[in-house]
Amino acid sequence: MSKTKDQRTAKTLERTWDTLNHLLFISSCLYKLNLKSIAQITLSILAMIISTSLIIAAIIFIASANHKVTLTTAIIQDATSQIKNTTPTYLTQNPQLGISFSNLSETTSQPTTTPAPTTPSAESTPQSTTVKTKNTTTTQIQPSKPTTKQRQNKPPNKPNNDFHFEVFNFVPCSICSNNPTCWAICKRIPNKKPGKKTTTKPTKKPTIKTTKKDLKPQTTKPKEVLTTKPTEKPTINTTRTNIRTTLLTTNTTGNPEYTSQKETLHSTSPEGNPSPSQVYTTSEYPSQPPSPSNTTN
């Protein structure tokens, strides 16, 4: 009955919780709308009431859960105390096992057993025996022929120092007590197992290829001197004419006289050497010889 009541209360609390959550959501949505002041006030009051009721419901729910926990713990404690007070007797009917009645505590009274009827088929069928203690009755069902499994004989644990028999092929000195021949042959072994030797392989050096150089002396060729030939200029025969004009001088008598005209012609030979100048003197009037005063060199 108590379980059904607890379930009902839990369901009612869940329903109230859900309804209050829905109401709070609806009131918050309505409050966002621009309503009149009276409606907003009523919605705010309703939201406050719903929130307080939610808090109260949560407290009730937590309290009921704690009550359930305390009830279960009390039931467990009662059961353990009853188990401690009761001392069941272990009954066996097989005389081969050599087990007799044994009471675990001296405080309990002697158990009353009801003997089972002896029939020829009693050995094959299981028999039930009832044992009465202070206020509790326990029934025990025991088979007539218990199955016994053969236990596997485990090998004895080897001592820690016996590892050398498997590893080494010689006689350890721990065996020799007073035998001199044994002491002559045996070898002392450390207590700890020998660790693996770390072998470091030598790193191969990189092979450097060497090319044999020619032992013949290198013949150095002399550098060729670049000779620049002068470019031959074309020979151009140029004639320079130095014409000196004679100034017309008028005599006091009024007869004009022409002075001699000198022409110098300079010609260049193909080798570039200038030729001697030739001077030509002419006179306009052959009848009159040129006077030294009028001629100009």
Curated annotation (Swiss-Prot):
Write out the topological domains of type Cytoplasmic. 1-37
Where are stretches of biased composition, namely Pro residues?
A: 287-297
User: From start to end residue, where is composition biased (Low complexity)?
Assistant: 105-139, 235-253
Lineage: superkingdom = Viruses
Q: Where is the composition biased (Polar residues)?
A: 140-150, 254-285
Biased composition range(s): Basic residues: 190-207
One GO term describing the cellular component = extracellular region
What residue intervals traverse the membrane?
38-66
Q: Tell me the segments the record calls region Binding to host heparan sulfate.
A: 187-198
Keywords carried by this UniProt record: Disulfide bond, Glycoprotein, Host cell membrane, Host membrane, Host-virus interaction, Membrane, Secreted, Transmembrane, Transmembrane helix, Viral attachment to host cell, Viral immunoevasion, Virion, Virus entry into host cell
Q: Where is the composition biased (Basic and acidic residues)?
A: 211-232
| Protein name per its UniProtKB record | Major surface glycoprotein G
